Curated annotation (Swiss-Prot):
Belongs to the arthropod phospholipase D family. Class II subfamily. One of its GO terms (biological process) is lipid catabolic process. It comes from the Eukaryota. This is Dermonecrotic toxin LsaSicTox-alphaIB1av. CDD domains: GDPD_like_SMaseD_PLD. One of its GO terms (molecular function) is metal ion binding.
């Protein structure tokens, strides 16, 4: 589910069939994650201005992903944080990673004590901000919870050349847990050329990509095209549309909605 920035929207999107949500994270000038907020402009047909304070949103997300909580959704297994680091200087990326890790540790993971269980993808728009990953990782180690990195994956969302993305991961010391996004706002059309390159990298013996997702897909025809290209995930404003297509006979044998027992960091071999 795309652009889920208010706590009330978590229920809304999961009830429509989403097993994953994407949330925008904006930063203040000191690189603190401040709001879950997208702002104007955003996808056609959506309200761009829903928001929460980041730490408040994490509290709601924790409840939605903690078994036994009254707000728990068993189906919600993955959260993509779309990190709006464009407002930061390049040299603040490490600090942003540090502060993000501290916020998640406190407000989502409950300091490692029965916190939220969802897998997290840190989605970064700029390859030059790879040190955000370093800062995040080193902070969890320093705070004595390196095991939480098992729950964390990565994405560079700028539609960069696949080879350049590989170099950024090398600099960040990342060797797994890689999701590769490709896409554009639903107001515009985008072909599947780069998606096919990403899928080819995923399926090659020496690729760096574990999963490929495509955004923002709102129509049945474009959903089918993306599935035919071999994507692992689809980001949408209308989870019920994707669920409908997945129930068509052409797709039921090959695709299903992932559950918590599926490993989001493992490349699917069919």
């Amino acid at each position: 589910g795309h652009m889920v920035n208010a706590i009330a929207q978590i229920d809304e999107f999961v009830n429509l069939g989403a097993n994953s949500i994407e949330t925008d994270v904006s930063f203040d000038k000191n690189a603190n994650p401040e709001y879950t907020y997208h702002g104007i402009p955003c996808d056609c047909g959506r309200t761009c201005t829903k928001w929460e304070y980041f730490n408040t949103f994490l509290g709601g997300l924790r409840k939605a992903t903690t078994p036994g909580d009254s707000k728990y959704h068993e189906k919600l297994v993955l959260v993509v944080f779309d990190l709006k680091t464009g407002s930061l200087y390049d040299n603040q990326a490490y600090d942003a990673g540090t502060k993000l890790a501290k916020s998640l540790l406190q407000n989502y993971w409950n300091k490692g004590n029965n916190g939220g269980r969802a897998y997290i993808v840190l989605s970064i728009p700029n390859l030059d901000h790879y040190k955000l990953i370093t800062g995040f990782k080193e902070t969890l180690t320093k705070e004595e919870h390196p095991e939480l990195m098992d729950k964390v994956g990565y994405d560079f969302s700028g539609n960069d050349d696949i080879g350049d993305v590989a170099k950024a991961y090398k600099k960040a010391g990342v060797t797994g847990h890689v999701w590769q996004s490709d896409g554009i706002t639903n107001c515009l059309l985008r072909g599947l050329d780069r998606v096919r390159k990403a899928v080819a990298n995923r399926d090659s013996s020496n690729g760096y990509i574990n999963k490929v997702y495509y955004w923002t897909v709102d129509k049945r025809a474009s959903t089918r095209d993306a599935l035919d290209a071999g994507v692992d995930g689809i980001m949408t404003n209308y989870p019920d549309v994707i669920a409908d297509v997945l129930s068509e006979s052409a797709y039921t044998a090959k695709f299903r909605i992932a559950t918590y027992d599926d490993n989001p960091w493992e490349t699917f071999k069919n």
